[in-house]
C-alpha cells in the first residue's frame, strides 16, 4: 500500500470515483482516476430515478467532504477490475470512505456481489437527521422540483 498527497482534485466523477493529481515526490505528479476502496454508492447515471437521486446526493456529499479537507491524501491498493486505482481517501486521520458509509451515502463493498438497499441508506440518513435526502428522492419520483 502506498500513500500520496493529493495536489488537486480534477473531477468528482460520482460518489465513489474521483480524478486527482497525486504528488509522487521529487516534483513529479500524475493524474489518476481513483475508485474509492471498500465502498459502493448508488449510481448517478441510471434510469432508476430513486437510485439516480441518491447517487447525485452521494456525489454532492463527497464533493462537500473533499472541499472541507485540509490535507487530502490517498492510501492506494492494487488497481481495480476496470483499471482504476483503488484507494482510501483521508483528511488527517479521518477515513472519508468509511464516513460515507456511516453517514448513509455508501454501502460497504468488498468487490463481490453488490447488496444495494436504498432503504438501508435512507434509514441511516434519517437516523442522523438528514431529511433533505428523502425530499429529493420523493421529488425525483414525482418528477417535480423542490425550491
Residue ranges and their predicted role:
Residues 1-147:
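Small beta-barrel nucleic-acid-binding modules, primarily SNase/OB-fold domains
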Amino acid at each position: 500500500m502506498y500513500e500520496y498527497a493529493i495536489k488537486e482534485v480534477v473531477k468528482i466523477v460520482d460518489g465513489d470515483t474521483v480524478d486527482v493529481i497525486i504528488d509522487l515526490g521529487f516534483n513529479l505528479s500524475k493524474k489518476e482516476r481513483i475508485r474509492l476502496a471498500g465502498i459502493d454508492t448508488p449510481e448517478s447515471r441510471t434510469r432508476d430515478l430513486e437510485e439516480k437521486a441518491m447517487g447525485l446526493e452521494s456525489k454532492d456529499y463527497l464533493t462537500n467532504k473533499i472541499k472541507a479537507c485540509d490535507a487530502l491524501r490517498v492510501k492506494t491498493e492494487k488497481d481495480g477490475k476496470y483499471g482504476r486505482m483503488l484507494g482510501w481517501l483521508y483528511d488527517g486521520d479521518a477515513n472519508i470512505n468509511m464516513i460515507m458509509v456511516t453517514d448513509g451515502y455508501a454501502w460497504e463493498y468488498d468487490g463481490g456481489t453488490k447488496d444495494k438497499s436504498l432503504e438501508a441508506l435512507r434509514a441511516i440518513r434519517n437516523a442522523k437527521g438528514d431529511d433533505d435526502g428523502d425530499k429529493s428522492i420523493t421529488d425525483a419520483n414525482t418528477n417535480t422540483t423542490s425550491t
